[in-house]
A protein has these predicted regions:
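Short, charged, low-complexity patches
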Residues: 209, 213-225
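Glycine-rich portal/gate segments that line the openings of hydrophobic small-molecule binding cavities
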Residues: 2-11, 30-35, 46, 79-80, ...
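Extracytoplasmic entry segments of secretory-pathway proteins
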Residues: 70-71, 94, 104, 120
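Short acidic N-proximal helix/loop "leader" segments that mark the beginning
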Residues: 52-93
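Short, glycine/acidic-rich beta->alpha junctions
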Residues: 90-92, 156, 220
Length: 238
């Protein structure tokens, strides 16, 4: 139960901050005249209210489009990837990518071994462990962790995780409910790592994702891409 409570706190924290800005913006509109009558309070509250009013718009039209396609080219955003067929008409789609200055054969092993009970996710380990994930990020490639069977669970937490929908060694791994981890060579010395997630076009699912998952997902996934890049470029192999 403690892990569940901590998990919700970690998950909801960033989104609650956004919600507070929305509330502040609403109050700015509703009580604007009252601020004029209470000049002392106005001096304290008006900057916060203005920020609260502006932030949701900035998030919707600037920040959100940026983070949904962080690091990805227009071509990468538009092209089909393995696993797209699992959610053919998504309500929300994110495509994020990073360039790794290492050959694809040196990058793929880091992706292949992701999982709570394997190499971790190369993200904010301390934050994952606040939610009781018991995560440890590997700093080397483990040969014994280089294969996944379709239907196997990739654990995010000791008790939960998505199933493997497809595993194409050296190319892509698709997880149900998450999306695809893909590796695409640029040339002999550099590689693109692409992560795509698709959320079904169902109102309840979309609301849940927007209100609880979207911001933490970006924060953790961005760090994961950077973590893979750092490890592959250092070439830490057994």
């Amino acid at each position: 139960m403690t892990d569940i409570v901590r998990g919700f706190g970690v998950l909801l924290g960033p989104t609650l901050v956004l919600d507070l800005f929305v509330v502040a913006g609403t109050l700015a509109v509703v009580t604007g005249r009252g601020f004029d009558r209470r000049k002392g309070a106005a001096r304290l509250l008006r900057p916060l209210a203005l920020l609260g009013a502006a932030f949701p718009w900035a998030y919707a039209f600037v920040i959100r489009p940026w983070h949904l396609r962080w690091g990805a080219t227009g071509e990468e955003v538009d092209k089909p990837l393995p696993g797209d067929d699992l959610v053919p008409e998504p309500g929300i789609e994110s495509t994020r990518a990073i360039t790794v200055e290492a050959p694809a054969g040196k990058v793929w092993p880091w992706l292949a071994q992701v999982g709570q009970d394997r190499g971790g996710f190369y993200s904010y380990e301390w934050l994952e462990n606040l939610a009781g994930a018991q995560m440890h990020n590997a700093d080397r490639v483990h040969p014994e962790w280089q294969h996944r069977d379709v239907g196997e669970i990739v654990f995010l937490h000791p008790a939960i995780g998505p199933k493997v929908a497809a595993f194409e060694p050296g190319t892509a791994m698709v997880l149900e409910g998450w999306g695809v981890f893909a590796v695409e060579p640029i040339d002999e010395h550099s590689t693109r790592v692409i992560l795509r997630s698709r959320t079904p076009r169902r109102l309840g699912v979309l609301l849940y994702y927007l209100l609880t998952i979207e911001i933490p997902h970006f924060v953790m996934e961005r760090r994961m891409l950077k973590g893979i890049k750092e490890r592959a470029e250092k070439g830490r192999n057994p």
